[in-house]
Curated annotation (Swiss-Prot):
The lineage of its organism: Bacteria, Pseudomonadati, Pseudomonadota, Gammaproteobacteria, Pseudomonadales. Catalyzes the cross-linking of a glutamate residue and a tyrosine residue in the PqqA protein as part of the biosynthesis of pyrroloquinoline quinone (PQQ). Keywords: 4Fe-4S, Iron, Iron-sulfur, Metal-binding, Oxidoreductase, PQQ biosynthesis, S-adenosyl-L-methionine. GO terms for molecular function: 4 iron, 4 sulfur cluster binding; cyclase activity; iron ion binding; oxidoreductase activity; S-adenosyl-L-methionine binding. Belongs to the radical SAM superfamily. PqqE family. It holds the Pfam family Fer4_12. Interacts with PqqD. The interaction is necessary for activity of PqqE. Binds 1 [4Fe-4S] cluster. The cluster is coordinated with 3 cysteines and an exchangeable S-adenosyl-L-methionine. GO terms for biological process: pyrroloquinoline quinone biosynthetic process. [4Fe-4S] cluster binds at C33, C37, C40. This is PqqA peptide cyclase. Its cofactor is [4Fe-4S] cluster. InterPro entries: 4Fe4S-binding_SPASM_dom (IPR023885), Aldolase_TIM (IPR013785), Elp3/MiaA/NifB-like_rSAM (IPR006638), MoaA_NifB_PqqE_Fe-S-bd_CS (IPR000385), PQQ_synth_PqqE_bac (IPR011843), PqqE-like (IPR017200), Radical_SAM_PqqE_MftC-like (IPR050377), rSAM (IPR007197).
Length: 389
């Protein structure tokens, strides 16, 4: 396929693509963020990343992705609210026909902005919390005002007719209070609540020993969640509780992103295109939207084709009868834990490196690291990490 970008009004799409369409576009607008969450999935060296894409460059990305079949866009970061052109980007995404999501901490959000985003056509707002009580929330966020701001904005989102979607990242320091978390969500009249146990990428991987819950903590938390689900169902209550367990307590890997470069496409603040938001850490030269069309990136680039299909797989994945279900698991996790992204995801009990996972489980039983001892995601720490790498 040619490297020349096709005409904007008539992009070439293979009649029967060998891969899926990029249905889900994650627009990481910025790595700037007022919070310092120690489980952030942003790269450790975010402080040395390049200049952010301009408004016009994001318009081009969205148009090309939409013409290729992308249906849903998530505006993320960092904190996307620091971008002064966010309402413009939302309006353009709506004009192009995207279903639009704003994934935010709520810091920097105001009622005036909510109204402006509604007018621009925003479909969905997800607000994240760090904990159910102010002290722990603010300690994890690195901000003394974060909790009060989040509460106020969650209520404002509901007031202006959006479905209330709340996200709580749970870990060993807050998971034992999952009942309080759910009660807070019900008090805020949440429609959907994602109780997402920490996934260990980026800063969370760096802090894994201090964040990974024990097996007993997870079992109790899921039992409490199921009790609330039963109560809500009996009351015909509309709130839906989604409980996400960490990979580290599974015996089979997830079908990460439904397969490498299959439906999901991330564009980072500097324009680097990735098949998942954690892939930047790999020793692979990924394409940039400043230099290539989205068409070329998705279908022709080495980075997006590197782990498509099954031919790249070594054993035990190559001969495994489950490979079409899980695609060998997460490539980023394989790279982080074994140093080779082509290895089987160590989460899988068939992996030759599964002992790394069982060792992490054992370490969680005796871990003593406090919140204060975690490495917080901020510019200073990022620069130190970048300097030492």
């Amino acid at each position: 396929m040619s490297d020349i970008a096709p005409a904007a009004h008539s992009p070439y799409i293979p009649p029967t693509p060998e891969v899926g369409l990029p249905l889900w576009l994650l627009a990481e607008l910025t790595y700037r963020c007022p919070l310092q969450c120690p489980y952030c999935s942003n790269p450790l060296d975010f402080a040395r990343q390049g200049q952010e894409l301009t408004t016009e460059q994001w318009f081009k990305v969205m148009q090309e992705a939409r013409e290729m079949g992308a249906a849903q866009i998530g505006f993320s970061g960092g904190e996307p609210l620091v971008r002064q052109d966010l309402a413009e980007l939302i309006a353009e995404a709506r004009r192009l026909g995207f279903y639009t999501n704003l994934i935010t901490s709520g810091i920097g959000l105001t009622e005036e902005k909510i109204i402006a985003f509604k007018k621009a056509g925003l479909d969905h707002i997800q607000i994240s919390f760090q904990a159910s009580d102010e002290q722990v929330n603010n300690m994890l966020a690195g901000s003394k005002k974060a909790f009060a701001q989040k509460l106020e904005m969650a209520k404002a989102v509901k007031k202006h007719g959006y479905p209330m979607v709340l996200n709580f990242v749970t870990h060993r320091h807050n998971i034992d209070r999952i009942d309080k978390i759910i009660e807070l969500c019900l008090a805020l009249e949440a429609d959907f609540v994602e109780l997402a146990t920490c996934q260990f990428y980026g800063w969370a991987h760096l802090n894994r020993v201090g964040l990974l819950p024990t097996k007993d903590q997870l079992v109790r938390a899921e039992a409490v969640t199921n009790e609330y689900r039963d109560q809500l169902a009996a009351q015909d209550h509309p709130c839906k509780l989604i409980f996400v367990t960490p990979d580290y307590y599974e015996e089979r890997p997830k079908a990460c992103m439904n397969g490498w470069g299959n439906i999901f496409l991330t564009v980072t603040p500097d324009g680097t295109a990735l098949p998942c938001h954690g892939a930047r850490q790999m020793p692979i030269q990924f394409p940039n939207v400043r230099e290539h069309s989205m068409q070329h990136i998705w279908y022709d680039s080495f980075g997006f084709n590197r782990f498509r299909g099954y031919d790249w797989m070594p054993e035990p994945c190559r001969s495994c009868d489950e490979k079409e279900k899980d695609f060998g698991g997460c490539r980023c996790q394989a790279f982080m834990l074994t140093g080779d992204a082509a290895n089987a995801d160590p989460v899988c009990s068939k992996s030759y490196h599964h002992g790394i996972i069982t060792q992490a489980r054992d370490e969680s039983e005796t871990a003593t690291q406090t919140i204060e001892e975690l490495a917080f995601r901020n510019d200073r720490n990022s620069r130190l990490i970048a300097k030492s790498s």
